[in-house]
Amino acid sequence: MKSGFISLIGRTNAGKSSLLNYLLNEKISMVSHKQNATRRKINGIVMHKDSQAIFIDTPGLHESNKTMNKLMVEAAIKSIGDCDLLLFVASVFDNIENYKKFLNLKKDAPHLIAITKIDEASDKEIFAKLNEYQIYSDEFKAIIPLSVKKQAYKNILLDEIYKYLPEHEYFYDPQYLTTANEREIFRDFILEAVYECVSDEVPYSTDVNVDKVVEKQNITEIYATIITDNEHHKAILIGKNGQTIKRIGINARKIINTLLNNKIFLKINVKIDKNWNSNESIIKKNFLY
């Protein structure tokens, strides 16, 4: 019996959240084409052979002077020291400089490399990228190309991870998919809908708080608040005659329905908190951890 923790590490938009959902065969982590979508660590639990692999989806590694972004990167780096194995995730189109920066981080755990989005590249491009990493073959244990869309090489990756998990009893019930509670997942799904429906800088000055969840026999009622930092962004989120907030609600319900069998009643309000994304204590307490 084996059990251990694996941290998913990589730049923003490398495909870490998509990879986690793929490994779980279930959507628990928000996915967006926008950078820095993942703001808090989410644990996903995968059973493979006689092992339990607990994957930690971390915020992407990036450079920024903003308080929120700095704390996100700190959370990602901290997870490196807490894990048995690291999985560096990079798109086949990513510059290898990102991997060099990763190697400069202090780490004791072994690591694998997952090269994602190979379905979008030619065989020539894939082989060229794999060859780039061979310069550092003494650093990593294995490099695995992956396609989430085509569902390719999943078991090869899990077999490699299995080799490096420590002998240990399971940390969680094998039936669990995640350590996140429903509110945390709902919050991420609503935020994903915000990212889908509004553009530019609005999502980066926005977060979501799930105020209340009421479970009834045939319906789940979710009451949430979108928090933003100024009147202009609030107006954009609501939209003319409330059309944007309505669209956010429709999209969020669709995403939440991938997880729940019940009907969904979702009530979303929008409020302003000018300091939410610059106050370190607020971020740590309510959003990041």
Swiss-Prot record:
Spell out the SUPFAM superfamilies in the cross-references: P-loop containing nucleoside triphosphate hydrolases (SSF52540), Prokaryotic type KH domain (KH-domain type II) (SSF54814)
Q: Where in the cell is it found?
A: Cytoplasm; Cell inner membrane
GO cellular-component terms in the record?
cytosol; plasma membrane
Q: Where is this region: G1?
A: 10-17
**Where GTP is bound, by residue?**
10-17, 57-61, 116-119
Do you know which Pfam families this protein is assigned to? Answer: KH_2, MMR_HSR1
Region of interest: G2: 36-40
Residues of the region (G3) are 57-60
Recorded hits in CDD domains, A to Z, give: Era, KH-II_Era
Keywords from the UniProt entry: Cell inner membrane, Cell membrane, Cytoplasm, GTP-binding, Membrane, Nucleotide-binding, Ribosome biogenesis, RNA-binding, rRNA-binding
Task: Identify the stretch(es) annotated as G4.
Answer: 116-119
Domain (Era-type G): give its ranges.
Answer: 2-167
Topology versus the membrane? Peripheral membrane protein
Q: Give the UniProt family note.
A: Belongs to the TRAFAC class TrmE-Era-EngA-EngB-Septin-like GTPase superfamily. Era GTPase family.
Quaternary state and interactors: Monomer.
Tell me, in a sentence or two, what this protein's role is. Answer: An essential GTPase that binds both GDP and GTP, with rapid nucleotide exchange. Plays a role in 16S rRNA processing and 30S ribosomal subunit biogenesis and possibly also in cell cycle regulation and energy metabolism.
Q: Which PANTHER family match?
A: GTPASE ERA, GTPASE ERA, MITOCHONDRIAL
Name assigned to this protein: GTPase Era
Source organism of the structure:
Campylobacter fetus subsp. fetus (strain 82-40)
